[in-house]
Amino acid sequence: MGAAGRQDFLFKAMLTISWLTLTCFPGATSTVAAGCPDQSPELQPWNPGHDQDHHVHIGQGKTLLLTSSATVYSIHISEGGKLVIKDHDEPIVLRTRHILIDNGGELHAGSALCPFQGNFTIILYGRADEGIQPDPYYGLKYIGVGKGGALELHGQKKLSWTFLNKTLHPGGMAEGGYFFERSWGHRGVIVHVIDPKSGTVIHSDRFDTYRSKKESERLVQYLNAVPDGRILSVAVNDEGSRNLDDMARKAMTKLGSKHFLHLGFRHPWSFLTVKGNPSSSVEDHIEYHGHRGSAAARVFKLFQTEHGEYFNVSLSSEWVQDVEWTEWFDHDKVSQTKGGEKISDLWKAHPGKICNRPIDIQATTMDGVNLSTEVVYKKGQDYRFACYDRGRACRSYRVRFLCGKPVRPKLTVTIDTNVNSTILNLEDNVQSWKPGDTLVIASTDYSMYQAEEFQVLPCRSCAPNQVKVAGKPMYLHIGEEIDGVDMRAEVGLLSRNIIVMGEMEDKCYPYRNHICNFFDFDTFGGHIKFALGFKAAHLEGTELKHMGQQLVGQYPIHFHLAGDVDERGGYDPPTYIRDLSIHHTFSRCVTVHGSNGLLIKDVVGYNSLGHCFFTEDGPEERNTFDHCLGLLVKSGTLLPSDRDSKMCKMITEDSYPGYIPKPRQDCNAVSTFWMANPNNNLINCAAAGSEETGFWFIFHHVPTGPSVGMYSPGYSEHIPLGKFYNNRAHSNYRAGMIIDNGVKTTEASAKDKRPFLSIISARYSPHQDADPLKPREPAIIRHFIAYKNQDHGAWLRGGDVWLDSCRFADNGIGLTLASGGTFPYDDGSKQEIKNSLFVGESGNVGTEMMDNRIWGPGGLDHSGRTLPIGQNFPIRGIQLYDGPINIQNCTFRKFVALEGRHTSALAFRLNNAWQSCPHNNVTGIAFEDVPITSRVFFGEPGPWFNQLDMDGDKTSVFHDVDGSVSEYPGSYLTKNDNWLVRHPDCINVPDWRGAICSGCYAQMYIQAYKTSNLRMKIIKNDFPSHPLYLEGALTRSTHYQQYQPVVTLQKGYTIHWDQTAPAELAIWLINFNKGDWIRVGLCYPRGTTFSILSDVHNRLLKQTSKTGVFVRTLQMDKVEQSYPGRSHYYWDEDSGLLFLKLKAQNEREKFAFCSMKGCERIKIKALIPKNAGVSDCTATAYPKFTERAVVDVPMPKKLFGSQLKTKDHFLEVKMESSKQHFFHLWNDFAYIEVDGKKYPSSEDGIQVVVIDGNQGRVVSHTSFRNSILQGIPWQLFNYVATIPDNSIVLMASKGRYVSRGPWTRVLEKLGADRGLKLKEQMAFVGFKGSFRPIWVTLDTEDHKAKIFQVVPIPVVKKKKL
């Protein structure tokens, strides 16, 4: 007996036992009713007929059994009344305006132990504009379950949703049947013999009738041996006519061919027939068009199997011309020729790179924006082309050409056993899905609109985990793990045998302001609402469609202020909704409002308006969303967070007059799972496509709406996160997941004109019992998968937010962990991710569509693929931001930068004004298929990065604890031009636009009061020629400004301003350990007097304690001396600098920004003379206070050999050429060092070291004396000419070398800029090859030239975008 048979037997046995119990024990009636409610003998058959004016009241103990379809005005079940639906073969449709169940009333269709097996539909009808007075609580078109009411809907047990287990390709080509394709190397006549009963290939063979006449004889013998009735598929690949004899030609003619008799050289020819039935033949033939022209002969024929199913045989014999785009060519001149650019001119400029007759031309701006092109023809050939930018001739642009390759042969045989149908291979047993059921397959690309619906067909040959569906997929739907990430498409069941649906009009009508401006369809559907005190609510196996209204409170399923609905509320069994499909809804899917403990399990929400799974006011807790699927979630009009940009701008009735909408800030937040309280459980859920976000945890500082007062302010921001594991998010625009932001909990006013519940700022910091004075309790996110989200895989702001064993792939930005722009909101907390995988560009390339604007090259193979945002968008794995962050034991895979697209595994937030913590730690990182040049990118001015001149852009830094990123354990990686953290031994990484340094680092947080438009200049005393300019993080409309540079400890600094110095200033010591110090000189106008004190500020308790004062000293040395409560400042009025030593006095926790006692601050009040000028003391400060640059913390040794985990690695290159002064003598000093091995120079002139760019080995080193450089420079030219391509060439001068003359042109050949002028000292890293790497560097100065940098090995040219 099969599984289904056993289930039927057990079900019948249970019913038999129930009836025996009823017969022997009459008191057991209630037990039977609970098992199969329609079998109770108390029920009275009821058939009210069809009367739209009939107001039905079922009460006073009436128990009715609805046995047939009916139409009534309304139904009210109360006072112990009960309506039960008869379970039999005849479908029952109950059509009514509304159903109200309260005061002991009950409605039953099936039960948990006896699921309803027939078909039952409730249709809620009516328009909003009929003049009918809506119920003040329930409205119109509803099923209302009030106090004492019970609603029990229990449909058939069916699998709710599962995963695709085999990839579906567009058109279904790879889903069953047979596919055969050959090109070169498979010449001749190809024959397939096909069984007409099943469509399977019985045998196939190849006959090389080009090579030998014996092959013709063998072909005839083969065809004669095939029994009549078999299907023959015959075609030529490449060439088959040269030794094709008459016997073979006649044999094919006998089978029904008309063209084989005259087959010529390389003619494409295809033929299908049934042996013994020449009239069944189909045939195609075409002559060969030469090596530059495509030609194809194609046939197909439909056959029917013995089971009545159809299969299609397709056959093609072709000469195919493949095409490819050339590289991009930069063009920076406006055409001076009338009629456009001559293509011949480009041929000359780029010989061998452009074909003679391009098929197509593309042009873009230098930033990648598409431009219009026009091809002008002359005598049938491409003669000129013109480029236009908004109607004008382009000035500076890039152009490329589509060129055809020589043709190649191609033979294809396809047998499609699923004609206009597709077999789905699924993870689970889906035998509960029946013919006629509707399924939806989720998108596995960036666009959620690639979700597709299919109808199940009968399939006798399907396995238990297979179904046949009508039609073919339009899009690629992944059904496998790709690059370590489970990207399988979700497949949801939409059909159920119990249906609750709204009756809809054909088009939109204006029952609410603006509604028809946004929707062209009727959105006034039905809804189900549960009120406080309902008796029971259990819904399963039910389909809800056309439900919800664009009115607040009218949702498909709505638990409204119901309180505790589980055991805590006295419900046994606890309330649940499970195994539901809620689709094509007009306002959400499931709303939990002021209700706790609800189980929402195995629910599919599809094609909804507004947040799908929605918690409303903030106090909703302990609800569990288990194995729920939401997809195709679109914007709605109800709340600002539901609205898209158009709605946000048009719907302003709930705002204060004068409000100017900012859609991306105030609105644009529609989400599949909208969690207004973190203390809810999300397990095994999938957010498979929303206009904005998959999972969004949002915070209500105080409860809103009717829930006002249910918790104290700030409770939701501190409550620990419920269970969150095994969830997945993809095909969303903004993010797969967000923990951040709040909603505005006050009405619109003159002070804040934004509408109630607009999106605002909020911070999450989970603590035990939601008490910030109790220990922190981290929010744990485990086994989360985020892929194909256009912007972010996840944006998570904390507090302690920790991720473990997560997977991110194909997101614009995989993950951003944020804390606070100035401080972590919860000081001492951290954000962490460990044991996780990030994939930049996976094997899921998506589907190219005609209107897909974001398609372009990518991945390791540079093939076409869908892209997240723009062709040149800098894809990033983890975006470092704020801090402190810990990244541990993570793997990065397939991040490959292109020339024009700065893809990287690790990077920083773009256009960042905020702080960057030097204690952002990275350890245990592994890279797979990530070139070492693409591991990190600090940014550069250009598209997406803009000018890279915001404060956070300039101060980016992180700690490479074990060297797994940089190969330098314990190093700090920083932007290459941040001289506040650099020292003389830092090593540049040009590919990253960064530097590898060592040291002890912290931050200063400087607040300048009563001003917001000052630009601050800070200088480290040992590098006075390299200031750092900070604009301030805040807008110019604030009453103060703040600056937060990362600084090297135990160093001296000066601070200057572009206007008069601020009269009030506070300096906070951030990330200082006890005893850490810096010395600061602040520029003020002469005549200024000061009042300076120190204090400790406890941000949590908002308490400040004064700890001391600074008194003036006339001796600079005394600044170094301090005593408890008393320190010194030195006012050097000549230079205009106020000197202070800032030293931390208290211990600090590991991840805290401030000490355990609070934040240590120094406050300065300055009485500044009126009309004082600009406070920039640089000219008087230096060289007076210049300090010698020293390395306090030695650079770590680079990892080598077996310590490295990847084949590519960095080669360390150090070069110095300088004059060193010893007493009264000057000594010339020069050397080249490669990976720790020095090559000193002994003679004046040029030293040269050549390195193999593939292996990183030094292959030669020599020197050229001045006499050679000056007299016989061709020796150097000849030497360079013999250097193999792909070689790194290092050069350093020594002594008074010849810095001018013909020999310097060698530098240009090795990548130096043309027209260079050398000074007295020179160091150069060059490259001999066909391209110029970014790391080619020339340093030339009068006294010292120095290059410390790394070069990637092997040297590989980046592919162009």
Curated annotation (Swiss-Prot):
Tell me what induces its expression: Up-regulated by histamine. Up-regulated by the adapter protein complex 1 (AP-1) and NF-kappaB/RELA. Down-regulated by transforming growth factor TGFB1.
> In the UniProt record, does the keyword Secreted occur?
yes
Instruction: Name the top EC class.
Output: hydrolase
GO molecular function terms attached to this record: carbohydrate binding; clathrin heavy chain binding; ER retention sequence binding; hyaluronic acid binding; hyalurononglucosaminidase activity
In residue numbers, the region (Necessary for its endoplasmic reticulum (ER) retention and interaction with HSPA5) covers: 295-591
Q: Which GO terms describe its cellular component?
A: clathrin-coated endocytic vesicle; clathrin-coated pit; clathrin-coated vesicle membrane; cytoplasm; endoplasmic reticulum; extracellular region; fibrillar center; nuclear membrane
Annotated ranges, domain GG-type lectin: 176-317, 1227-1361
Q: Which InterPro entries match?
A: CEMIP/CEMIP2 (IPR052252), CEMIP_beta-hel_dom (IPR055401), CEMIP_X (IPR055400), G8_domain (IPR019316), ILEI/PANDER_dom (IPR039477), Pectin_lyase_fold/virulence (IPR011050), TMEM2_PANDER-like (IPR039473), WxxW_domain (IPR025155)
Location relative to the cell: Nucleus; Cytoplasm; Endoplasmic reticulum; Cell membrane
Any matching Pfam family: CEMIP_beta-hel
Q: Which residues are glycosylated?
A: 119, 165, 312, 370, 420, 889, 921
What GO biological process terms are annotated to this protein in UniProt? hyaluronan biosynthetic process; hyaluronan catabolic process; positive regulation of cell migration; positive regulation of peptidyl-threonine phosphorylation; positive regulation of protein kinase C activity; positive regulation of protein targeting to membrane; positive regulation of release of sequestered calcium ion into cytosol; sensory perception of sound
| Reported regulation of activity | Activity is up-regulated by histamine.
What catalytic activity does the UniProt entry give for this protein?
Answer: Random hydrolysis of (1->4)-linkages between N-acetyl-beta-D-glucosamine and D-glucuronate residues in hyaluronate
Give the E.C. number(s). Answer: 3.2.1.35
Every copy of the G8 domain together lies at 44-166
Matching PANTHER family, A to Z?
Answer: CELL MIGRATION-INDUCING AND HYALURONAN-BINDING PROTEIN, TRANSMEMBRANE PROTEIN 2-RELATED
Family membership: Belongs to the CEMIP family.
**Name of the protein described by the UniProt record:** Cell migration-inducing and hyaluronan-binding protein
Source species, please? Homo sapiens
